[in-house]
UniProtKB/Swiss-Prot annotation:
Listed name of the protein: Glucose 1-dehydrogenase
UniProt KW Phosphoprotein keyword: no
Coiled-coil parts of chain: none
Origin species: Priestia megaterium
Subunit and interaction comment: Homotetramer.
Residues the entry annotates as binding NADP(+): 11-35
A GO MF term: glucose 1-dehydrogenase (NAD+) activity
Xref: NCBIfam families: PRK07231.1, PRK08936.1
Length: 261
């Protein structure tokens, strides 16, 4: 537990399911005030609110598409209107879909880039604007991936979005460090989320993924939420401009284990 997170206001995009849901619940247990964002499934967002209430937390749900500028502006303003301020912005919303690069339509490309990269930029911009105008030493956390470092065939749009996020985060961190605003990435590896449920339910596919992880197991959403809580806390007060990989060692070239290579 991080006592300094108590009373902080945290906005998490794409937080009605998966990693975002786990982060919302974790910050609620830290006694932060949480803004749950969803794009279309209000019932999922309401379910998260119920879970937050069960742990004694305080939260609201705000509908919005991170690819729509006015929706992102409204999301941040809703947090400020409801809770009086904003302290932590977590740009978590994202998507992926496999397509051979030579068959990828411009629409396929734009959909992923607009959600993963442009959406994170808009969230970062609106949060930082508020921090600067109100002299707040706030925190921005962007949800990147091991694929900001590891190439991923059939997912060139996704890899490009996360590679772009890496330098976006580093640039924002450098630009706003003098004002005490911290900007960091989290780079998850293989995590047990709904988007991966079908794949990991297949024993052969699961074993194949686990073979790429030196620690030998697929991570849980709560392990990513723990990283987010630390990065948002004063324990990480001197940390900015990094990607903190939470991947069981996946980015450490496991094929070279045991002296191979």
């Amino acid at each position: 537990m991080y006592k300094d997170l108590e009373g902080k206001v945290v906005v998490i995009t794409g937080s009605s399911t998966g990693l975002g849901k786990s982060m919302a619940i974790r910050f609620a247990t830290e006694k932060a005030k949480v803004v749950v964002n969803y794009r279309s499934k209000e019932d999922e967002a309401n379910s998260v609110l119920e879970e937050i209430k069960k742990v004694g937390g305080e939260a609201i749900a705000v509908k919005g598409d991170v690819t729509v500028e006015s929706d992102v502006i409204n999301l941040v303003q809703s947090a400020i209107k409801e809770f009086g301020k904003l302290d932590v912005m977590i740009n978590n919303a994202g998507l992926e879909n496999p397509v051979s690069s030579h068959e990828m339509s411009l629409s396929d490309w734009n959909k992923v880039i607009d959600t993963n990269l442009t959406g994170a930029f808009l969230g970062s911009r609106e949060a930082i604007k508020y921090f600067v105008e109100n002299d707040i030493k706030g925190t921005v956390i962007n949800m990147s991936s091991v694929h900001e470092k590891i190439p991923w065939p059939l997912f060139v749009h996704y890899a490009a979005s996360k590679g772009g996020m890496k330098l976006m985060t580093e640039t924002l961190a450098l630009e706003y460090a003098p004002k005490g605003i911290r900007v960091n990435n989290i780079g998850p590896g293989a995590i047990n989320t709904p988007i991966n449920a079908e794949k990991f339910a297949d024993p052969e596919q699961r074993a194949d993924v686990e073979s790429m992880i030196p620690m030998g197991y697929i991570g849980e959403p709560e392990e990513i939420a723990a990283v987010a809580a630390w990065l948002a806390s004063s324990e990480a007060s001197y940390v900015t401009g990094i990607t903190l990989f939470a991947d069981g060692g996946m980015t450490q070239y496991p094929s070279f284990q045991a002296g191979r290579g």
